[in-house]
């Protein structure tokens, strides 16, 4: 697959183009092989250098990369025996939320996540990963099913936000989100939430309340997009970089604030460079967290979860 490079990756793109050009020449020339090897190392070093100093708004660009692995990609790489479950039993089946029963290393779990879609047809069908109320109600139905059978719940967050259309508001978008926050806080099974791309506001939180919150290294989590924030505060989306810095949207910043428990390392250059490696890292992290949670008594699980969220926003006054 040909990689799409972001604007700040253009020096890398030029090196990769040169490498591809040389690869199409006589592959038996030893000098040529050495030159390609040297350029590959140079590209790797340059990628490392650029990604070591990404600004917050550049991290947001990586989180939205069109080739970044989505929920269904992780599902195929990490799980077996997936059986999708459809509908909220009240209105419709929202394709922006995918969920169902699956196994991870043989252990039965309930998997739920937001899916953006790859091509135009899929993006439209999945509403670009922006769930409607019926999507969140479907997610809650699946969580309650998991609770009934004592299955851990694994959620994968990747949305610019809940769908803000009039029809969604008419069907109770805010109520659906609020209901999920309440119900997830009281689920009597382990809940592990992972931000794999964009974690956009209440649309992300509606499947983001759990015992453990993890973020992929180049994912983001925020109450509003940098562009949206800039449009409100500066009346100009061009100030997105300033907004991103002020919002503190990146995994390291959120872990520093105690809002995230673990950062899952991505391959050099981002998860889209090597989706299988990214999935392997995430799978290891989930299995590790499941091992820590699976034998906790229900009362202890709920109390720890409650205290975890009660600590949010605490600060000391000097």
UniProtKB/Swiss-Prot annotation:
Lineage per the UniProt record: Bacteria, Pseudomonadati, Pseudomonadota, Gammaproteobacteria, Thiotrichales
Q: According to its UniProt record, which protein family does this protein belong to?
A: Belongs to the AccA family.
* Biological processes, Gene Ontology terms: fatty acid biosynthetic process; malonyl-CoA biosynthetic process
Q: Which InterPro entries match?
A: Acetyl_CoA_COase_a_su, ClpP/crotonase-like_dom_sf, COA_CT_C
Report what the protein is called: Acetyl-coenzyme A carboxylase carboxyl transferase subunit alpha
Q: Where in the cell is it found?
A: Cytoplasm
- Is Lipid biosynthesis one of the keywords UniProt gives this record? yes
What does the UniProt keyword field contain?
ATP-binding, Cytoplasm, Fatty acid biosynthesis, Fatty acid metabolism, Lipid biosynthesis, Lipid metabolism, Nucleotide-binding, Transferase
The family database entries (PROSITE patterns) matched by this protein are listed as:
COA_CT_CTER (PS50989)
The protein's annotated catalytic reaction(s) are: N(6)-carboxybiotinyl-L-lysyl-[protein] + acetyl-CoA = N(6)-biotinyl-L-lysyl-[protein] + malonyl-CoA
This chain's function reads: Component of the acetyl coenzyme A carboxylase (ACC) complex. First, biotin carboxylase catalyzes the carboxylation of biotin on its carrier protein (BCCP) and then the CO(2) group is transferred by the carboxyltransferase to acetyl-CoA to form malonyl-CoA.
Claim: Nucleotide-binding is one of the keywords in the record: yes
Name the encoding gene, please. Answer: accA
One GO cellular component from the entry?
acetyl-CoA carboxylase complex
Naturally occurring in which organism (per UniProt): Hydrogenovibrio crunogenus (strain DSM 25203 / XCL-2)
